[in-house]
Amino acid sequence: YEILRCLVGSEMCIRDRTFDVVMKDFLAWCGEDFMFGTWGPQDLTELQKNMRFFGMEPLGKGPVRFYDIQKLFSIAYEDQKVRRSLEYAVDYLQIPKDIPFHRAISDAVYTARVFQMIKDPIALQRVSFDTFQLPENHRSEVHVVFDNYAKYISRPFPDKEALMADKEVLSTRCYLCHHNLRKKVRWFSPNGKHYYSLSWCDKHGWMKGKIRVKKAEDDMVYAVKTTKLVGEKEVAALMERKDHIRQLRKEHR
């Protein structure tokens, strides 16, 4: 930390180097085989926006894999859903607080220290994907299987109608046996942004699907779809939700 602070406080500030020069040096320091780790999901998007502003080449073609250490902390130590502050995680793990928070270098140091404490192999499998750069075509779309669910990230589409007409977006395939499944509850949406489905696998049981429709650049849209095997309780809750939406729509006709 002392070395980094000296570099930031003297050499780099005196030179007053531009972002693109510093970023090129940083990427050279990272080398060929590296992976970003951030506290939360937004940093890589902002980084790549700055890179584009300065006319730099993107980090790669398509979504960038990275570790969202905030998410990994929740998977390893809490309920997998809650998102805590960096200082909360530092306190929880009893990491010494010997440098100030809310500064770029010190927060990076604390994030690395939290990451060092995460040993859960399931958590470490859960890589995230920054979607500033989307898949260019059907072949480069993201398909990844984790310990208990699968994720798919589509290429961009001109509008939601085209997106929700695509066979791959709408497909429900068991991520364990790779069989195409018949939907027991077809895709439905409570709000036009999130879509849900329910399918049955003869070998593995009920599978819940969720599609999140997200905005891309140039007024385009893309899909992030997750599929997960679920139990009877979640099946009943999803069916009840669909019935509730159907009833509300009847009342508003």
Enumerate the language-model features and the residues they cover.
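DEDD superfamily 3′-5′ metal-dependent exonuclease/proofreading module
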Residues: 15-253
